[in-house]
């Protein structure tokens, strides 16, 4: 019987290391939590890709918030071999932008997520994705990844939320909206940002949405939420 190999044993080994290959081979599937989170991340900015025609896949992450990417790497700990790396660039306004990048190693375990989001090497939304695969935890990671306030004016009482879905087609965003409204009893609609579709969750749906996602929003990302009048017993609970 092959001895179980711990992640600490394979740090700094080359890609062709026998021990590294044994470590990868002992992993089989993502956990149910990793699948839930993965769906939420891929609805946002994370990307899944294959370099061997779909035999294996890996997920790539890049965000400005260091605490958030550290949290994600911890959630996918056994699949991430290197810590987040700092990336610097100059934007179109001439300002320095710092982000943090990380990725999992390629593995068959990520193929399940690839089947949900990738068609002909491009990101897509399958029919009934929300109804069949999205949970409140998925919603929370989708929001942390690519959501925000509709109204950023200081002191605003507007609790409307936006999910930035500009990378998807109008039909795909409509499918997401229908799923959200049906499964989670929200009242979402489509709006446009620079002629690209986004999902608008109105003020009157916010309390429902908040109670769904609040248990899973990490402390460092709660600034993205509008103020909330009420309490949640799970406010600081992180799964």
From Swiss-Prot:
Its EC number is 3.1.-.-. PANTHER family: PENTATRICOPEPTIDE REPEAT-CONTAINING PROTEIN OTP51, CHLOROPLASTIC. Its main location: mitochondrion. It comes from Zygosaccharomyces bisporus. Belongs to the LAGLIDADG endonuclease family. Keywords: Endonuclease, Hydrolase, Intron homing, Mitochondrion, Nuclease. Signal peptide: none annotated. The keyword Transcription regulation does not apply. It is an enzyme of class 3 (hydrolase). This is Probable intron-encoded endonuclease I-ZbiI. GO terms for biological process: Group II intron splicing; intron homing; mRNA cis splicing, via spliceosome. Pfam families: LAGLIDADG_2. Endonuclease involved in mitochondrial 21S rRNA gene intron homing.
């Amino acid at each position: 019987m092959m001895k179980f190999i711990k992640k600490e044993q394979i740090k700094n080994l080359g890609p062709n290391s026998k021990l590294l290959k044994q470590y990868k081979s002992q992993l089989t599937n993502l956990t149910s939590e990793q699948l839930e989170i993965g769906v939420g991340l891929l609805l946002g900015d994370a990307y899944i890709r294959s370099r061997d025609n779909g035999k294996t896949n890996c997920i790539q992450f890049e965000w400005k918030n260091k605490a958030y990417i550290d949290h994600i790497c911890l959630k996918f700990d056994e699949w991430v071999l290197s810590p987040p790396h700092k990336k610097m660039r100059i934007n179109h306004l001439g300002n320095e932008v710092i982000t943090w990048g990380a990725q999992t190693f390629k593995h068959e375990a990520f193929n399940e997520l690839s089947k949900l989001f990738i068609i002909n090497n491009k990101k897509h939304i399958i029919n009934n994705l929300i109804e069949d695969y999205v949970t409140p935890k998925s919603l929370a990671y989708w929001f942390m990844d690519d959501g925000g306030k509709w109204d950023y004016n200081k002191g605003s009482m507007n609790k409307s939320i936006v999910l930035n879905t500009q990378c998807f087609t109008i039909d795909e965003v409509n499918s997401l909206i229908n799923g959200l409204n049906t499964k989670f009893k929200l009242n979402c609609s489509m709006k446009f940002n620079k002629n690209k579709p986004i999902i608008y969750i109105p003020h009157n749906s916010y309390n429902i949405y908040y109670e769904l996602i609040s248990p899973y929003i990490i402390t460092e990302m709660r600034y993205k939420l509008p103020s909330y009048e009420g309490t949640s017993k799970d406010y600081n609970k992180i799964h």
